[in-house]
Regions:
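Conserved "landmark" site that anchors the functional core of diverse proteins
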Residues: 1-333
């Protein structure tokens, strides 16, 4: 159990999101980086849909109210327990009364704090994912008490995990959308040849892409009938400005979509920090299905990426959790 001492103001509970409510205008939401949920679940031996705390900006400061076990995944943050460093992509025991501090993300946008048993959060439309802009859930605030959904007494070894490679990506794969044909072959070629930069006007709803040169327009761009949209769609505004839609995107949109990023590449582009660059490549639906199948198999065996950590005793904040035996041994030649 944890108490929030300080936070960036944009941290919220997230799971794998809500499905089946798009027709009612309810966004999917869910973690921007679903790989991080699977990694945290593997470290804590629990369901990947367990609710985690998604951290945006400075992670925050937390008081440990009761002994618990946590895992840290996603974009790497400087982490410490009572001012002693904690390793990232790892699980840790926290003793009651200690202070957990998490800094600013270093190699991405979204970091995740997982609690053994999952965080307790209200289920709204079959999900604990918060979307405060839609009146669903809230951001965490100082003095909030973060409790486990389940209290799991059995001991579990601390582990580390080799994260899925997604933080150095410079390209994303996409498939044609229902509206790709509205763009001329010349415009599509220009799009895939262009290097885009991540703009600072980006959030959980979408990423604004900037580039040099004119926009990417279609004929009758502002007269297209609104249609269903999903995370991964790349919309072009009236000025031809591209936006990549993410977890909190709306359910309907009228801007034309030049393509849709395949799900396995969405965490990578979501994690790109402001100023990073990216290019896009169209692939066939058959290839996209093969990649998705490989991704599912990778996640099914993700626990195989877990290892017992090699740790420096001088830097172990949880050293007292281990039995250290001292004594003498007599041996006869």
């Amino acid at each position: 159990m944890l108490e929030v001492i300080s936070t960036s103001g944009f941290s919220s509970f997230q799971d794998m999101g809500r499905n089946g409510f798009r027709s009612q205008g309810i966004s999917r939401s869910g973690a921007a980086d679903y790989y991080a949920l699977f990694e945290g679940a593997a470290l804590l031996d629990q369901n990947p849909n367990s609710t985690a705390l998604e951290l945006i900006g400075n992670g925050g400061k937390f008081r440990v109210l009761q002994d618990c076990m946590v895992a840290l995944t996603g974009a790497i943050m400087p982490a410490s327990l009572d001012q002693k460093p904690l390793s990232w992509n790892s699980s840790h025991y926290l003793h009651g009364g200690s202070i957990l501090e998490l800094g600013a993300p270093q190699n991405g946008r979204y970091s995740y704090l997982h609690l053994r048993g999952g965080f307790k959060a209200p289920k709204i439309f079959n999900s604990s994912s918060a979307q405060p802009s839609a009146g669903i859930g809230k951001y965490t605030r100082p003095k909030d008490i973060l409790e486990p959904l389940e209290k799991i007494p059995e001991a579990l070894k601390c582990q580390t995990i080799e994260p899925v490679d997604r933080f150095e990506s410079t390209s994303c794969r996409l498939v044609e959308s229902f509206q790709t044909h509205l763009f001329t072959p010349k415009t599509i070629k220009k799009f895939v040849d262009t290097e885009f930069s991540i703009d600072n006007q980006s959030n959980r709803g979408g990423i604004k892409l900037t580039h040099t040169g004119s926009g990417f327009s279609t004929s009758n761009q502002l007269k297209i009938m609104s249609d269903m949209i999903i995370p991964g769609d790349i919309q072009m505004t009236g000025s031809g400005q591209p936006f990549v839609l993410l977890s909190d995107c709306q359910t309907m949109g009228g801007y034309p979509r030049i393509g849709c990023i395949i799900p396995p590449d969405l965490p990578a582009i979501a994690q790109l920090k402001t100023g990073r660059t990216v290019k896009f490549k169209f692939i066939s639906r058959d290839e996209a299905n093969r990649i998705a199948s490989k991704d599912r198999k990778c996640l099914e065996i993700i626990k195989e990426r877990c290892l017992e950590p090699i740790r420096d005793p001088q830097k172990m904040a949880d050293l007292l959790n281990f039995n250290l035996i001292d004594g003498a041994v007599w041996a006869k030649n």
